[in-house]
A protein has these predicted regions:
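Boundary-proximal intrinsically disordered activation/regulatory segments immediately upstream
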Residues: 1-63
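Glycine/small-residue-rich loop that forms an oxyanion/phosphate-binding "nest" at active or ligand-binding sites
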Residues: 67-99
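Nucleotide and nucleotide-moiety/phosphate-recognizing core
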Residues: 102
Length: 103
């Protein structure tokens, strides 16, 4: 697992674009899920995370190990950068990038 400390990190910026832009989601064929419940629901439905971003606090959650094992790439981020990936006031500490499934 790698650590990201800069808000200028390319992977972090790419994930943040998925949150902010429908066009980015369509072009990249990916979406960003926030929170353990949404990420675990996606995982249980058969989607595998391409990237998982987790804060130190988020690593304490019981489902963290399962998400990190399933993810292609995993990153630890500080709480200050979690706000960049969140549209909530208090980020839950875990964010996963998934491929948009074909219907």
């Amino acid at each position: 697992m790698q650590q990201i400390t800069s808000k200028e990190n390319a992977r972090l910026k790419s994930a943040a674009k998925l949150l902010q832009s429908k066009k980015a989601r369509q072009e990249q064929g990916e979406f960003l899920a926030e929170g353990y419940r949404l990420c675990m629901d996606a995982l249980r439905s058969g989607l595998l995370p391409r990237q998982t971003f987790v804060t130190e606090q988020g690593m304490e959650h019981q489902d963290c190990t399962e998400l990190l094992r399933a993810s292609e790439e995993s990153y630890v981020i500080p709480q200050s950068l979690a706000a960049k990936l969140s549209d909530t006031r208090t980020p839950q500490g875990v964010f996963c990038v998934f491929a948009i499934p074909d219907n």
